[in-house]
């Protein structure tokens, strides 16, 4: 039996090899969700990894990508209180941040000098609805709410620096997203998990209303209705079951089948942090996380799949064996303000690790190449106001030109 000319299928175990469902998956035929779930739960991890790498190689060949970025921590006050988070700060905390636009633009300008292309703008969830300090900060800046500030700041960043904004401000409404459509190449919003159980008393999202799956799903759908490319993802190891991981991935895939706008899914491993309600919880085991990653590739197929390298500093290269094709945003000049205890590896080190696994590391923009080089998709998903900023940066593959990164023009 042959599968689309693929030669390494014979390395599957006998039981896996004889299962017709794997050939349906590879050939993108309709697969019964119950059969798929049974396969993902019961198959040996080495078989799932091999299937995941076959699927990844069909779509991405030997190219692994990353986004060269700066992290603009605009405001870290947040109305939610997730049980695992240290990003959120109270207004009285000396580490509380409320930048003014000139400070944010200065960071973006430093990024441009460092040949970055993405300006990641991160905020807490609707801080002005909980904190008078945040409301006063916005008023002093001449805005009624955070969305107005994000729209204004994004326009200034792209026009003054040429950097492409990618905003992650939580569960935005359709109206709020539309305010960012002409200035942001894409958006970011983690689904985290689609299980309502995780919002119950004592669970990770009990005190985080915006993490209610209904709220997050509404935002994912709104982005789809706007043809707005978005990156989402799951947080693995917050007391979810593997079945809940599968259901979450199936939900993401169903939304993308309808709209085609989910450009990337992040599989993020939970790390307990001191001072949080979950500081004594355990991180997901390595085999479990590998199974989750492989399941993501098998379910999502041609959606880009990322694992943050800074959260698995000693083993992140192994995730290439489970089907990932992207390392996400890596900054040469700013820290990961969400996980400051986990510094990014250098881009040079990521390149070495990637090449040792037989892949080529290339920089991408915060909007994925398929939305740029395909004329039909480009007209739909890339806003016309951004095209003049995008075109000088990319090669024929929709990736960042090497000569730009090397400061040759």
Which stretches of residues belong to each language-model region?
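Glycine-rich, proline-tolerant flexible connector loops at the mouths of alpha/beta enzymes
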Residues: 68-70, 92, 122-142, 271-277, ...
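Hydrophobic faces of well-ordered beta-strands that scaffold small-molecule active sites
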Residues: 64-70, 119, 165-167, 187-189, ...
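Active-site-proximal loop/turn and secondary-structure-junction residues that shape catalytic pockets
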Residues: 70-72, 125-127, 169-173, 193-195, ...
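An N-cap/entry alpha-helix motif that binds or orients negatively charged groups
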Residues: 30-65
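Canonical Radical SAM [4Fe-4S] cluster-binding loop centered on the CxxxCxxC motif
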Residues: 58, 64-106, 126-127
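Conserved Radical SAM active-site core
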Residues: 91-257
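Auxiliary Fe-S-binding modules of radical SAM enzymes
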Residues: 1-43, 105, 112, 242, ...
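Active-site phosphate/pyrophosphate- and oxyanion-stabilizing loops and adjacent acidic/basic residues
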Residues: 53, 72, 155, 294
């Amino acid at each position: 039996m042959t599968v689309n000319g693929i030669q390494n299928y014979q390395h599957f175990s006998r039981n896996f090899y004889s299962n017709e469902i794997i050939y349906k998956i590879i050939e993108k035929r309709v697969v019964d969700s119950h059969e798929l779930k049974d396969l993902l739960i019961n198959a040996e991890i080495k078989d799932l990894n091999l299937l995941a790498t076959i699927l990844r190689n069909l779509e991405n060949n030997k190219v692994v990508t990353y986004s060269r970025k700066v992290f603009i921590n605009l405001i870290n006050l947040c109305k939610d209180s997730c049980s695992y988070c240290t990003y959120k700060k109270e207004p009285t905390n000396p580490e509380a941040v409320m930048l003014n636009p000139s400070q944010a633009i200065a960071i973006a300008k430093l990024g441009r000098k460092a040949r970055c292309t993405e300006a990641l703008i991160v905020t807490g969830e609707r801080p002005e609805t909980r904190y008078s300090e945040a409301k006063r900060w916005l008023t002093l800046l001449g805005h009624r709410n955070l969305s107005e500030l994000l729209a204004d700041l994004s326009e200034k960043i792209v026009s003054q620096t040429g950097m492409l904004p990618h905003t992650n401000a939580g569960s935005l409404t359709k109206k709020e997203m539309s305010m960012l459509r002409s200035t942001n190449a894409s958006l970011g919003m983690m689904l985290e998990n689609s299980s309502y159980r995780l919002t119950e008393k004592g669970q990770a999202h009990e005190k985080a209303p915006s993490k209610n799956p209904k709220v997050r799903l509404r935002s994912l759908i709104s982005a789809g209705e706007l043809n707005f490319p978005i990156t989402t993802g799951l947080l693995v190891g917050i007391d979810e079951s593997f079945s809940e991981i599968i259901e979450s991935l199936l939900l993401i895939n169903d939304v993308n089948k309808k709209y085609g706008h989910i450009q990337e899914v992040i599989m993020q491993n939970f790390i307990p942090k001191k001072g949080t309600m979950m500081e004594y919880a355990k991180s997901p085991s390595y085999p479990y996380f590998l199974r989750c990653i492989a399941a993501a590739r098998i379910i999502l197929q041609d959606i880009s799949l990322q694992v943050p390298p800074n959260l698995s500093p000693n083993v992140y290269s192994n995730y290439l064996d489970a089907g990932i094709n992207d390392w996400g945003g890596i900054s040469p000049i700013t820290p990961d303000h969400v996980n400051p205890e986990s510094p990014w590896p250098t881009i040079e080190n990521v390149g070495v690790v990637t090449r040792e696994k037989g892949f080529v590391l290339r920089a991408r923009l915060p909007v994925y190449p398929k939305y740029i080089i395909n004329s039909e998709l480009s007209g739909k998903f890339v806003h016309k106001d951004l095209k003049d900023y995008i075109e000088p940066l990319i090669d024929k593959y929709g990736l960042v030109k090497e000569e730009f990164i090397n400061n040759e023009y």
